[in-house]
């Protein structure tokens, strides 16, 4: 029965969108997964997609899937680059991972225009500026 399924709470795992400079000194944006737990997370799958509307027309991006074998304790892992041209969309990241034999999953959504200058802070876990998902 559905009521008998235990769904564990996701703790100390989050996402950030960072602003970086490449070797040509051009601005780039990247999405990272941060594991702030005292233990690794295993067999991590991240499904990303963008959706919303612009000028009254529905828009959506491709759905991408990323596999991370292990994200060690107190580290981060690069998921994907992200283009500023999709910041006006909902940018959704569905993260699933294992701790031992227990699966955990959580949906993270950066709502339209939340990835902006006003929301940029220093992300100490990765030593970069970006927008941290709460």
What are these regions (language model features)?
Residues 2-6, 80-134:
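Terminal connector regions
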Residues 36-40, 71-73, 99-103:
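A short, structured loop/turn motif at beta-sheet edges
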Residues 27, 31-42:
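Asparagine-centered strand-capping/turn motif at beta-strand->loop junctions
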Residues 22-31, 75, 79-80:
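Contiguous beta-strand segments within globular domains
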Residues 54-88:
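Intrinsically disordered, low-complexity Pro/Gly/Ser/Thr-rich segments with frequent PxxP/GP/PP motifs
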Residues 7-24:
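N-terminal edge beta-strand
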Residues 38-55:
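Short acidic, flexible loop segments centered on an aromatic residue
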């Amino acid at each position: 029965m559905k009521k008998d399924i235990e769904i564990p709470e996701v703790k100390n795992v989050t996402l950030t969108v960072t602003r970086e400079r490449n070797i040509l000194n051009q601005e780039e944006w990247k999405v990272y997964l941060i594991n702030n737990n005292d233990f690794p997370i295993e067999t991590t799958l991240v499904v990303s997609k963008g959706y919303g509307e612009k000028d009254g027309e529905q828009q959506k991006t491709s759905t991408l899937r990323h596999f991370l074998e292990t994200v060690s304790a107190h580290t981060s892992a690069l998921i994907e680059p992200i283009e500023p041209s999709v910041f006006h969309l909902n940018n959704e990241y569905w993260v699933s991972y294992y701790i031992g034999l227990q699966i955990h999953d959580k949906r993270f959504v950066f709502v339209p225009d939340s990835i902006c200058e006003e929301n940029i802070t220093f992300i100490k876990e990765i030593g970069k500026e970006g927008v941290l998902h709460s």
